[in-house]
């Protein structure tokens, strides 16, 4: 079968021919319809420091997808041939304390699809049936293919009660924009998103965010005054792991504010800890998606009218995958979808 693989320890992704994966007793075989390119896939393409430490070569990459069940392991129940599914990209052990205690997303033995085991940039994918999520009929393939990153956004945004709150989102990448849209959809008062990339800030404006602020051109304190905010932001969603953005967030949070951190900052990032302490801030680290509460919330949000369609900006055939990676690497894109049909 055709697959996109990391073949060499250097920049690039290559189209390859690999065997169809074998179906285990507890697995599903999925025929891939559409995949989306994640920022993680771009890191792997660029072969940065994280990729060099993490990715075994060769490796079929990718973890954002929608497809059709074409094979069912003999121990599997609850699925039928033809079911349309996406799936949780974190394969968990099932026997550690967190898994057994119902906190599966915190499994200490997590293995990543397309990172530590073969991924979805292929005609077929095998995953444990436990990880598969049936897609409702009224959700399109395009939207289903981005459920993985949408789940990061939903997990981050819904970490705290947002109704009537003022929310600051740092970083207008696709996940940041989706998180901001979720916050607005569920009842936040003001949702402000910051970045220096005007293309992506314009995407945020199309999603109905209260204010999309280019911090290279506007002062965030002036924006807060314009919105009638006198005490700071109640909730902060930190998406890019950018030290200057996080410091600005600490400066503008209200006392008792809550921050959810999805972004991964440099290990040597310095901040003014007195602001965390004297403001009584609560900081929560976010990893992946809650299994599987986040997945049900994703479907419900879309079914209740949340429109994510503007975030999908580019679509290519899998044979034009290079154009897709070029678009993602340019910074002038939202989500990029590759069709395998």
Swiss-Prot record:
Binding-site residues for NAD(+), renumbered to this chain? 175, 195, 200, 262-264, 286-287
Q: Where does Zn(2+) 1 bind?
A: 38, 63-64
Provide the cofactor note recorded for this chain's UniProt entry.
Binds 2 Zn(2+) ions per subunit.
Residues with site note (Important for catalytic activity for the proton relay mechanism but does not participate directly in the coordination of zinc atom): 148
Residue positions of the active site: 40 (charge relay system), 43 (charge relay system)
Cross-referenced SMART domains, in alphabetical order?
PKS_ER
List the GO biological process terms. Answer: L-threonine catabolic process to glycine
Q: Where in the cell is it found?
A: Cytoplasm
Q: What would be an example GO MF term here?
A: zinc ion binding
Q: Which cofactor does it need?
A: Zn(2+)
Alphabetically ordered keywords of this record: Cytoplasm, Metal-binding, NAD, Oxidoreductase, Zinc
SUPFAM superfamilies, alphabetically?
GroES-like, NAD(P)-binding Rossmann-fold domains
Q: What positions does the entry give for Zn(2+) 2 binding? A: 93, 96, 99, 107
Metal-binding recorded as keyword = yes
Primary enzyme class: oxidoreductase
An example Pfam family from this entry, by short name, is ADH_N
- Catalyzed reactions per annotation: L-threonine + NAD(+) = (2S)-2-amino-3-oxobutanoate + NADH + H(+)
Q: Which InterPro entries match?
A: ADH-like_C (IPR013149), ADH-like_N (IPR013154), ADH_Zn_CS (IPR002328), GroES-like_sf (IPR011032), L-Threonine_3-DHase (IPR004627), NAD(P)-bd_dom_sf (IPR036291), PKS_ER (IPR020843), Zn_alcohol_dh (IPR050129)
Q: Which HAMAP family match?
A: Thr_dehydrog
Give the family this protein belongs to, as stated in its UniProt record.
Belongs to the zinc-containing alcohol dehydrogenase family.
NCBIfam families on file: PRK05396.1 (NF003808), tdh (TIGR00692)
The name of this protein is L-threonine 3-dehydrogenase
List the source organism. Answer: Escherichia coli O139:H28 (strain E24377A / ETEC)
């Amino acid at each position: 079968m055709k697959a996109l693989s990391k073949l060499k320890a250097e920049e690039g992704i290559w189209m390859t021919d690999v065997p169809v994966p074998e179906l285990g007793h507890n697995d599903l075989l999925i025929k891939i319809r559409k995949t989306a390119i994640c920022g993680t896939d771009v890191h792997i393409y660029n072969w940065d420091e994280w990729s060099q430490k993490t990715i075994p070569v060769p490796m079929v990459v990718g973890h954002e997808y929608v497809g059709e069940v074409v094979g069912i392991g003999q121990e599997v129940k609850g699925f039928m041939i033809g079911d349309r599914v996406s799936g949780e990209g974190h394969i968990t052990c099932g026997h550690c304390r967190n898994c057994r205690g119902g906190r599966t997303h915190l499994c200490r033995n997590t293995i990543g699809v397309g990172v530590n085991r073969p991924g979805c940039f292929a005609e077929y994918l095998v995953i444990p049936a436990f990880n598969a999520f049936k897609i409702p009929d009224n959700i399109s393939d395009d939207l289903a293919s981005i459920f993985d990153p949408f789940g990061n956004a939903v997990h981050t945004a819904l970490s705290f009660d947002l109704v009537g709150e003022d929310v600051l989102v740092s970083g207008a990448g696709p996940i940041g924009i989706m998180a901001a849209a979720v916050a607005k959809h569920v009842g936040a008062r003001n949702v402000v998103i910051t970045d220096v990339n005007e293309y992506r800030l314009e995407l945020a404006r199309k999603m109905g965010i209260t204010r999309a602020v280019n911090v290279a051109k506007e002062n965030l304190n002036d924006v807060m005054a314009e919105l009638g905010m006198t005490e700071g932001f109640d909730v902060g969603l930190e998406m890019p792991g950018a030290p200057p953005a996080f410091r600005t967030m600490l400066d503008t949070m209200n006392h008792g504010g809550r921050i959810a951190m999805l972004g991964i900052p440099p290990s040597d990032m310095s901040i003014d800890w007195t602001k965390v302490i004297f403001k009584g801030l609560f900081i929560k680290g976010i990893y992946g998606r809650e299994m599987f509460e986040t997945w049900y919330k994703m479907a419900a949000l879309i079914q209740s009218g949340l429109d994510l369609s503007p975030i999908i900006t580019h679509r290519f055939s899998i044979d034009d995958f290079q154009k897709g990676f070029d678009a993602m690497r340019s910074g002038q894109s939202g989500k990029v979808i590759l069709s395998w049909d």
